[in-house]
């Protein structure tokens, strides 16, 4: 399922996603929807999200915990959405997500941790393939 970048990433969505994600009913609905979607795809899928490997798909064959410096993340987000997300907003979202009661942001068990602060998309993909031995 593909949406335009403007629909997936904009400052308004980023700002409110942590608040919405705190709601247990929303989390359960999203989780069940994703699991149903996954079960309909026999070849598997690649999915991104802050608790995909820890809560939604804890038994996934491959889990990547992708991290980068906050300044770089801010620049990348600006490039994606055309609007600037300040470093402070990124820090606040991380703090909220790590400290929320329902499904806090954690490094999933058995995840491969990759810091791509100084890597291009292509270099990041190469490292993932290498570390997962694909």
Task: Say what each PLM segment does.
Residues 68:
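A mobile, often basic/glycine-rich helix-loop segment
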Residues 19, 65, 112-113:
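Short aromatic/hydrophobic contact patches that present stacked aromatics
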Residues 72-82, 86:
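Conserved SF2 helicase motif VI
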Residues 38-42, 50-55, 59, 82-127:
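Small-molecule kinase domains that catalyze NTP-dependent phosphoryl transfer to phosphate-bearing small molecules
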Residues 16, 47, 76, 115:
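Thr-Gly-centered strand-to-loop micro-motif
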Residues 127-134:
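C-terminal alpha-helix
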Residues 1-43, 71, 88-101, 121, ...:
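ATP-dependent small-molecule kinase phosphotransfer cores
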């Amino acid at each position: 399922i593909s949406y335009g970048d403007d629909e997936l990433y904009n400052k308004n969505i980023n700002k409110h996603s942590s608040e919405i994600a705190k709601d247990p009913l929303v989390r359960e609905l999203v989780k069940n929807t994703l699991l149903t979607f996954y079960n309909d795809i026999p070849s598997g899928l690649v999915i991104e999200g802050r608790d995909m490997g820890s809560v939604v798909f804890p038994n996934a064959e491959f889990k990547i915990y992708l991290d980068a410096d906050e300044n770089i993340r801010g620049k990348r987000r600006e490039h994606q959405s055309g609007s600037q997300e300040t470093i402070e907003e990124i820090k606040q979202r991380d703090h909220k997500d790590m400290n929320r009661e329902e499904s806090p942001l954690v490094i999933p068990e058995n995840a491969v941790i990759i810091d791509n602060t100084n890597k291009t998309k292509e270099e990041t993909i190469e490292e993932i393939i290498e570390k997962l031995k694909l």
